[in-house]
Each structure stands twice: as structure tokens, then as C-alpha cells.
């Protein structure tokens, strides 16, 4: 009985950490789609903290989030964001989870990288205003 309670607790904690990482990644994607670095380092730090709490399964997420925190140029941040998004989408797939209500996984064909964004028109974080509508939603 105790083991079941602990398992349920840790599953809930992992779900909460995952939801927080997704929300922070969406915020980063939105900033990059608008060619801004506002709060990117702060959001990346929050993702790193949550990913670290999840341990080895989220290690790639943590590593990419750390890289984002060190980047000052938007091109470098976008490159690190690609790694973060691949790791986060891979983590969700491994957990058999969807991004959440009102969120979708999109893919940029130019860089062949995913991102999670709110439902609505494509807002490409990899090219921003240069190619804002470039991409498609994964089925």
C-alpha cells in the first residue's frame, strides 16, 4: 500500500515537472518567434531545475537548457532551443504523453526540428519574423 502511494506521489510530481517544462518551452518558443530573448534565460533555468528533478530520463533536456542559459546571440539560442525541443518531445514520447490541452507539436522543415506551441497559426521560433509561418503541426 505504501509503495502504491509513493508511486502515485512521484508520478504526480513528474507530471507537474513535465507540465512546467512544457509551459516554459512554449514561452521560449513565443519569444524566439518574435525575435526576442526576453526571459529566455530565466525560462531555460526553470526548465533545467525541473529536468534535473526528473533525473536521467530528462538529462538531455537539462543539458540543452544549460546551453540556452549560456547563449547570448539569438542564433545560438535558437540552436540550443532545437536541442531542447527535440529532447522534450522525445521525453514526452517516451512517457506516452501529449503536450497538453491547447498545445501542439510543430516541425520546421528547414531545420527539421520540433517545438511545442499553442494551437493556432504556426509561429516558427527557429526563423522568427524571417519565416514566421514556416512549419506544420505533427499529426
Language-model features, listed with the residues they occupy:
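Intrinsically disordered, low-complexity terminal tails/loops enriched in metal-binding residues
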Residues: 8-139
Amino acid at each position: 500500500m505504501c509503495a502504491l502511494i509513493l508511486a502515485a506521489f512521484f508520478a504526480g510530481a513528474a507530471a507537474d515537472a513535465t507540465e512546467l517544462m512544457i509551459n516554459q518551452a512554449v514561452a521560449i518558443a513565443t519569444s524566439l518567434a518574435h525575435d526576442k530573448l526576453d526571459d529566455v534565460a530565466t525560462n531555460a533555468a526553470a526548465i533545467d531545475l525541473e529536468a534535473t528533478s526528473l533525473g536521467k530520463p530528462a538529462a538531455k533536456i537539462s543539458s540543452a537548457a544549460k546551453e540556452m542559459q549560456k547563449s547570448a546571440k539569438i542564433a545560438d539560442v535558437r540552436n540550443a532551443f532545437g536541442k531542447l525541443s527535440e529532447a522534450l518531445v522525445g521525453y514526452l514520447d517516451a512517457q506516452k504523453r501529449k503536450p497538453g490541452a491547447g498545445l501542439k507539436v510543430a516541425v520546421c522543415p528547414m531545420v527539421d526540428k520540433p517545438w511545442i506551441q499553442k494551437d493556432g497559426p504556426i509561429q516558427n521560433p527557429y526563423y522568427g519574423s524571417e519565416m514566421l509561418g514556416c512549419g506544420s503541426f505533427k499529426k
